[in-house]
């Protein structure tokens, strides 16, 4: 399932709804009907969704629960739930559940048998706990992040006996540390794990194969098209040891190989020679893996078909 903010009536910002798409392979997606529409509390801003395996909220075992920000005269956090696999949602009669702030990311913290919410404030990420998704208790804060927080655990170098927690925000800055269900204690960072058009990326919890999969918002205008902006290709996150210490890596999911149609390899070439080779490759899309040596003091910009 993929839920996303959008305006179904025009290609300009405003009138935010939650759209819904589903996929069996993360490559091919089917758009379904919108699931959240504006109401008296405001338009539908960002949030997250969980599966309530233990029926903690009382809406049924395995109910799908959306936790979202309503943007009215003030920002509030709200709940909606689905008992038909996300096809339709009912908004909780007790909304709002929390006052100001926005962008709630919620997940189940098994060691303490409770829900955790990471919520953006004007200059920090606030951590809340709940037993039932409806009543939340403030626990701590992490300063220095802006919008759309994420918080999750990853093994270092694939070692399940050595795990660290990662906290990041919309722009891709992150810290590595420890988390006890209520307090995040940073050990390393802040670092930056991506550049380009990605913003406000979210990850999936409890994937069947244990991967930490991420989908981001691509801030790319498309003049003349019947849409504005896009969702980016899914990526897998991992923690790896480098010469500078443990860092967060972001790579396209392995399923991308199913989309490949032709392969080209070249090496030991200058930038000018690579450009000449690329002229003979006629395709609208290219998946490139490059190892580039850059002289000190210089930078590298990559263009394909006139686009950076």
Q: Locations of the language-model features?
A:
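A short loop-to-beta-strand structural motif that recurs across blades of beta-propeller domains
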Residues: 17-19, 65, 77-80, 124-126, ...
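Conserved Ser/Thr-centered positions that define the repeating blades of beta-propeller domains
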Residues: 23, 82-83, 127-130, 177-178
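Short glycine/acidic-enriched loop and turn motifs that connect beta-strands
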Residues: 7-11, 70-74, 123-124, 220-223
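Entry beta-strands of beta-propeller and related beta-repeat scaffolds
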Residues: 1-2, 55-67, 112-116, 159-166, ...
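Beta-rich accessory regions
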Residues: 180-196, 205-308
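Surface loop/turn signatures of beta-propeller and other carbohydrate-active proteins
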Residues: 10-13, 27-61, 86-108, 119, ...
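Surface-exposed extracellular loop regions of Gram-negative outer-membrane beta-barrel proteins
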Residues: 122-131, 138
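Beta-strand C-termini and the immediately following turn/loop, strongest in propeller blades
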Residues: 4-7, 68-72, 118-121, 169-170
């Amino acid at each position: 399932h993929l839920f996303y903010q959008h305006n179904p009536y025009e290609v300009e910002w405003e009138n935010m709804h939650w759209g819904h798409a589903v996929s069996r392979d993360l490559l091919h997606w089917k758009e379904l009907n919108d699931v959240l529409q504006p109401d008296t509390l405001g338009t539908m801003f960002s949030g997250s969704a969980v599966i309530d395996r233990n029926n903690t909220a009382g809406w049924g075992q395995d109910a799908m629960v959306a936790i979202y920000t309503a943007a009215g005269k003030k920002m509030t956090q709200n709940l909606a739930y689905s008992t038909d696999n996300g096809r339709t949602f009912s908004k909780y009669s007790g909304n709002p559940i929390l006052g100001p702030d926005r962008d709630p990311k919620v997940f189940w913290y098994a060691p303490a048998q409770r829900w955790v919410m990471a919520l953006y404030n004007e200059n920090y990420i606030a951590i809340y706990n709940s037993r039932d998704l409806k009543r939340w208790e403030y626990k701590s804060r992490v300063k220095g992040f802006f919008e759309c927080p994420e918080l999750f655990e990853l093994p270092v170098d694939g070692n399940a006996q050595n795990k660290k927690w990662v906290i990041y925000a919309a722009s891709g800055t992150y810290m590595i540390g420890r988390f006890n269900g209520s307090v995040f204690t940073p050990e390393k960072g802040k670092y930056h794990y991506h550049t380009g058009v990605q913003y406000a990326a979210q990850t999936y919890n409890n994937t069947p194969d244990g991967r930490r999969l991420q989908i981001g918002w691509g801030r790319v205008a498309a003049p003349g098209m019947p849409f504005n902006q896009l969702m980016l290709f899914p990526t897998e996150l991992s923690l790896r040891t480098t010469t500078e210490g443990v860092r967060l890596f972001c790579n396209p999911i392995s399923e991308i190989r199913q989309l490949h149609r032709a392969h080209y390899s070249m090496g030991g070439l200058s930038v000018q020679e690579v450009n000449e080779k690329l002229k003979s490759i006629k395709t609208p899309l290219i998946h490139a893996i490059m190892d580039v040596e850059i002289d000190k003091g210089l930078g590298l910009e990559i263009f394909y078909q006139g686009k950076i």
